[in-house]
Amino acid sequence: MNDVIRDFFKMESAGGILLVIAAAIAMVIANSPLNESYQAVLHTYVFGMSVSHWINDGLMAIFFLLIGLEVKRELLEGALKSRETAIFPAIAAVGGMLAPALIYVAFNGNDPEAIKGWAIPAATDIAFALGIMALLGKRVPVSLKVFLLALAIIDDLGVVVIIALFYSGDLSTLALTVGFAMTGVLFMLNAKNVTKLIWYIVVGFILWVAVLKSGVHATLAGVVIGFSIPLQGKKGEHSPLKHMEHALHPYVAFAILPVFAFANAGISLEGVSLSGLTSMLPLGIALGLLVGKPLGIFTFSWAAVKFGVAKLPEGVNFKHIFAVSVLCGIGFTMSIFISSLAFGGANPDFDTYSRLGILMGSTTAAVLGYFLLHVSLPKTAAESEKAIS
């Protein structure tokens, strides 16, 4: 289908391996004598923010910018162009947020402190999910990759809204006003057919700063910028959107995502007890991710097709959808972020055990999701092409 996406995921397969290696190294370091140095580096302040915040709010905004570009292009000229195919991942994402939250509440609804973490298993870590899928290379149909892209970004946008509504203590009205104004400027540039990317970069940077200062998760700015970049260039010009995609791909695949994994995967197991590990909090999170995610995504997807609201993407069957739904149980970094908002300051023990629940659920979902994809996909790239044609 689209050579740009194929090239991206071909390169991403190597990036996916780096992602897993970086996460594994971080876990080893966090549980070794080097943990103190590891934490010290991440919490070192540079230009008013810690290194960890620069990675999660700065570098990851670039990743979300790339995702915004990918999804916009697919909506306009690719696999999500029709209403039926575009609505499919949106419905799946809604199910993928509702079911995990309900499972968590079933385990922790009677605890007034633990209930604050109800949104923790509702998240999907798009970076890790894409990295695991990319390990299977060209065996994965392009349409299935696009489905995961769209589902995960809608899921993450939903979580951003949840954070803004339920976990943002002090929202800055001034910063939000500037953010909305810059969003308007970006789409005005698009409407006026401005194709020079420098204008989008300058205004987008101001938007990112405004969103960062507003109290809302700064990565949302990357998505907005991505959707504002024009797909069509002026006569005789290349597509600005595709040009930016090509420019960002190697940096995202081989630098940003591995650094992101290294900075976020280091969870210390010091002081952890078996009774704490099997308590309602970590179990609710782990089962929310491992059971709730696939239950919600698959059920809503099946119902959407069954009742004629949407249709399956080309070359994709329900075995593939179920495998991807399990893969979406990798909540990891976005879940950890919500955990820190819910428990970090007031209850460090809750924060520790919630992170372990996230780790248990996400790791199991990653292994099981990879296995299910491996056995359900065509054995070769050629067979995958034949299934689509």
Swiss-Prot record:
Pfam families in alphabetical order: Na_H_antiport_1
Membrane topology reported for the UniProt record: Multi-pass membrane protein
Listed InterPro entries: Na/H_antiporter_dom_sf, NhaA
Subcellular location: Cell inner membrane
Reactions catalysed: Na(+)(in) + 2 H(+)(out) = Na(+)(out) + 2 H(+)(in)
Record keywords: Antiport, Cell inner membrane, Cell membrane, Ion transport, Membrane, Sodium, Sodium transport, Transmembrane, Transmembrane helix, Transport
GO cellular component: plasma membrane
Superkingdom of the source species: Bacteria
One GO process term, biological-process aspect: regulation of pH
GO molecular function: sodium:proton antiporter activity
Residue intervals passing through the bilayer: 14-34, 47-67, 87-107, 117-137, 146-166, 171-191, 197-217, 252-272, 280-300, 321-341, 356-376
Family affiliation: Belongs to the NhaA Na(+)/H(+) (TC 2.A.33) antiporter family.
Job description of the protein: Na(+)/H(+) antiporter that extrudes sodium in exchange for external protons.
Protein name: Na(+)/H(+) antiporter NhaA
The organism of origin for this protein: Vibrio vulnificus (strain YJ016)
Lineage: Bacteria, Pseudomonadati, Pseudomonadota, Gammaproteobacteria, Vibrionales
